[in-house]
Amino acid sequence: MEETFVPFEGIKNDLKGRLMCYKQDWTGGFKAGFRILAPTTYIFFASAIPVISFGEQLERSTDGVLTAVQTLASTAICGMIHSIIGGQPLLILGVAEPTVIMYTFMFNFAKARPELGRDLFLAWSGWVCVWTALMLFVLAICGACSIINRFTRVAGELFGLLIAMLFMQQAIKGLVDEFRIPERENQKLKEFLPSWRFANGMFALVLSFGLLLTGLRSRKARSWRYGTGWLRSLIADYGVPLMVLVWTGVSYIPAGDVPKGIPRRLFSPNPWSPGAYGNWTVVKEMLDVPIVYIIGAFIPASMIAVLYYFDHSVASQLAQQKEFNLRKPSSYHYDLLLLGFLTLMCGLLGVPPSNGVIPQSPMHTKSLATLKYQLLRNRLVATARRSIKTNASLGQLYDNMQEAYHHMQTPLVYQQPQGLKELKESTIQATTFTGNLNAPVDETLFDIEKEIDDLLPVEVKEQRVSNLLQSTMVGGCVAAMPILKMIPTSVLWGYFAFMAIESLPGNQFWERILLLFTAPSRRFKVLEDYHATFVETVPFKTIAMFTLFQTTYLLICFGLTWIPIAGVMFPLMIMFLIPVRQYLLPRFFKGAHLQDLDAAEYEEAPALPFNLAAETEIGSTTSYPGDLEILDEVMTRSRGEFRHTSSPKVTSSSSTPVNNRSLSQVFSPRVSGIRLGQMSPRVVGNSPKPASCGRSPLNQSSSN
């Protein structure tokens, strides 16, 4: 993204670029037909369950002022508006954990002030949203998104681990509360007797750990040996919501003399019940807030503005990674401006604001990449079969596929249809294997399934329909509140723990923490699997010092969230990492080491073959995963980043790609080869090339 700080320049460029493809955003989605429902349903479950969980967390933290009704309504309204008039339709909006934390701090502050109290909390938070919106307007107009790249991996991964800790904290706190008598409840009820409280707590542990373990297991279903491919894909994509249903069903097993309140379930008023819509008229009470608190609302608003600026922009950035080969322009500045209007609207409606969320945004793009792959593959396979039936030559077959590929694209007038060029280059490479390009072709010469898989690049079905549909479905959950209230709260605590653990793989900060606790005699095992490149290029002592710095900073941020009033300042600590990384860390670490430890992209090295004989034997019988499994493996689960496979030079901090560099300039990443660090599987072999077996700093430190 080009840096521009001329007022309104970034917004103007974003609007100009997105308006040119606005019509195509809709027609492309409708042309996909019913196939668009698969990514829509996938991202709906990924959005709805966390929002329901955050609603239960807010209900407890705000004494019932805010519930799942408000979090679902905010997510639905903001999502629908963004999908219609937003810049980047791949970006998913929703109420996020940082917003819940900030609103918890604000409620505790208001509750402790007689001038505000519980009754004026929403009115005061409305003023906070007004100030937040004004600051977001200023940031968008001045082009602040131009410097989002200065938030390096240090800040992003530390923030991610902080959120994981807060998720786990909420899960533990919720489970402990299952053994206690809830506030605002009649303590004389049978279910609150000591014996029944203990029974409720133990049953809550069963439900929570049941969801956690089965949810984690289902995420790896695509690599299972059992079941058909479609069944494994179904479990991998929808296993977590299915497990929520399963364990909710298990919660209804107790019967007979068991009190009705065991286990405890989600509490929220129905949206049509008397008093449930009091939030929507909060704007009438905003003038009742004392002037000193209206001015004072600027302090938490500045923290929320910083938080949204960072979180929203990074979510949009991860949804538009270059490996997705997106054809349409970005819209960082305009989307931040729109977020300001959405925040203002939410404040006036008395609901918590929504912003871009991680990892749902890159998950949305990934699901649409799978859809585009399926659509392209079906069209090209049908074209190839028709060409073979008419005894076409190899050259004619590729010409026909080029034409079919061209019809599948609706490129903008100012963009080049890169797919046509790549098919042409693939054809040239194919002649080295097949001989005469004009020779007759049949299925023994041209393996339709394999050859077309090799030709297809990673592309995304960029459109607005899936985002609009999933937001509408989230809104439908508000009407389904009587059904949602059947979910046990302990299942939601298990889901919080699931989100915490699920966010750790792919976080290099977490991987370094694990490395510090690995016995020196066992560190070589890290090298036997795909691993971060810094493991081979940076001395272990430097890795340890850098990790200790990050851990200390993380604990300071986490400790800050425990301080009643000062806790609202934790986003400022994340922003402070920019000057710390730019000016302070270079004084203590070598630039080359910092470049590897704080790489802009997620880079990893292939496994080092410590047992070459065993590797050869295994490699001769290895079968390769399907494309959907590859897309799961190629992206980190914590932030939805693409993994970049490279073979680092032990003597240098720089890395050289495993594949031929000249090929990387011709071919875009393929679905069937990107995980293996290849650019074109039809030119390069389908197995990763082993890295040099030189001694890495990790080996040297562990051999002592």
Swiss-Prot record:
Give the transmembrane ranges. Answer: 36-56, 76-96, 121-141, 156-176, 196-216, 234-254, 290-310, 338-358, 481-501, 558-578
Lipid bilayer topology? Multi-pass membrane protein
Question: Which is a Gene Ontology cellular component entry for this protein?
Answer: plasma membrane
Q: Does the keyword Transmembrane apply?
A: yes
Q: Specify residue ranges for compositional bias: Low complexity.
A: 647-664
Which residue intervals are topologically Extracellular? 57-75, 142-155, 217-233, 311-337, 502-557
Substitution effect: residue 405 to A: Affects polar localization and vacuolar targeting
In which tissues has expression of this protein been reported? Answer: Expressed in proximal side of various root cells, notably in the columella, lateral root cap, epidermis and endodermis in tip and elongation zones of the root. Also detected in the epidermis, cortex, endodermis, and stele cells of the root hair zone. Observed in cotyledons and hypocotyls.
**GO-annotated biological processes:** borate transmembrane transport; cellular response to boron-containing substance levels; monoatomic anion transport; response to boron-containing substance
Query: Where do the record's region annotations for Disordered lie?
Result: 641-704
Localization (cell): Cell membrane; Endosome membrane; Vacuole membrane
User: Keywords on this record?
Assistant: Anion exchange, Cell membrane, Endosome, Ion transport, Membrane, Transmembrane, Transmembrane helix, Transport, Vacuole
The chain's disulfide connectivity reads none
Q: Name one Pfam family in it.
A: HCO3_cotransp
Gene Ontology terms for molecular function:
active borate transmembrane transporter activity; solute:inorganic anion antiporter activity
Enumerate the Cytoplasmic topological stretches.
1-35, 97-120, 177-195, 255-289, 359-480, 579-704
Q: Does the keyword Transmembrane apply?
A: yes
Q: What does this protein do?
A: Efflux-type boron (B) transporter for xylem loading, responsive of boron translocation from roots to shoots under boron limitation. Boron is essential for maintaining the integrity of plants cell walls.
Similarity remark:
Belongs to the anion exchanger (TC 2.A.31.3) family.
Under which name does UniProt file this protein?
Boron transporter 1
What organism is the protein native to? Arabidopsis thaliana
